[in-house]
Amino acid sequence: ESGRMAVIDIGSSSVRLVIYDDVQGYPFLILNQKIWAAFAENKGEGEFNLEQTKIDRVMAALEWFIWTARQTQCSHMVVFATSAVREAQNGKDFVQQAERKIGGRIHILSGEAEAHLATTGAMASIPDAKGVVIDLGGGSLELSDTSQKHFTSLPLGVLSLKALSGDDPVKAKAILVKEIQKIDWLKDLPGNSIVAIGSGMRSIARLHMAAFDYPLEITHDYNLPPETGIEFCQKLINGEDMGVRVQNISKAYKDVLPYRAAALCALLELENIDNVRFATFGIREGVLFSQMASCPVSRDPLKAFALELAHRQGR
């Protein structure tokens, strides 16, 4: 479908609106807005509920996002929710209330669907990657091999890890290592790379780039070998001051950065991993591509975008 498309992601940490222009060809991002929600903040073991104050905050965000999508003349919109809403005792009640607010349907993604869509997005931006895709949210950790034959969803997002570990990143890493060791298909990957998606993971890349004076401010396909990544992540887990300041990393992201580092470190310690590659596209782009008649996953992203730009701007 041509024209503009809006994707609203009701995540376990935040609620985000992204708007893409001309989704008939290769998508061009024109708007990206986020509201911190922390739905999974009290999600540990056992049952949990979405807190009313956070529900109210999300409802206000949805109202604002719907208005924004209409003002930007989006021809199509998809709204989806992930693990916190899926697993909360009052998740269904929240969805019914939210659907009345937006006047449309909210798709509740299963853990497998999250992993599949995240991998679809990741592979559209790094089509030559082979290995495992990691998508660490607030309430869950999704893992998929790049060939999309195997998917695993663990209830171990950064906020749930924080609760389960008693706010101890070292203990959180131990929890992750134990659970990751149970995943047999990780021993027989189609390649040797970790493809890390999401702005939280890219924050780790940005900190590493700043610490080592990397000359470009481009995190896409920035990669680290295991020994370098493990050493750097271990410093973040231990709360060491990196001695650098990076703009546009929010306090909320900084607070859970050690838990992101714990997840990445646990995977980098696998014997068959050669590097980690940080990707720009993720689950929202996967949702976008799932709505398109022709998904560009198999195309080179730079060539596809250049061709689309030439068609749009050429005279």
What are these regions (language model features)?
Residues G3, N32, A129:
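Conserved catalytic motifs of the protein kinase core domain
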Residues G3-L29:
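N-terminal basic/disordered segments at the start of proteins
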Residues M5-D9, G131-D135, I194:
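Short glycine-aspartate micro-motif
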Residues I19-D22, N42-W67, Q71-C74, V85-A124, ...:
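Helical "lid/coupling" subdomains associated with nucleotide-phosphate turnover
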Residues Q24-E41, R70, H76:
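Conserved ATP-binding subdomain of kinase catalytic cores across diverse folds
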Residues G138-D145:
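Acidic, divalent-metal-coordinating active-site segment for phosphoryl/phosphodiester hydrolysis
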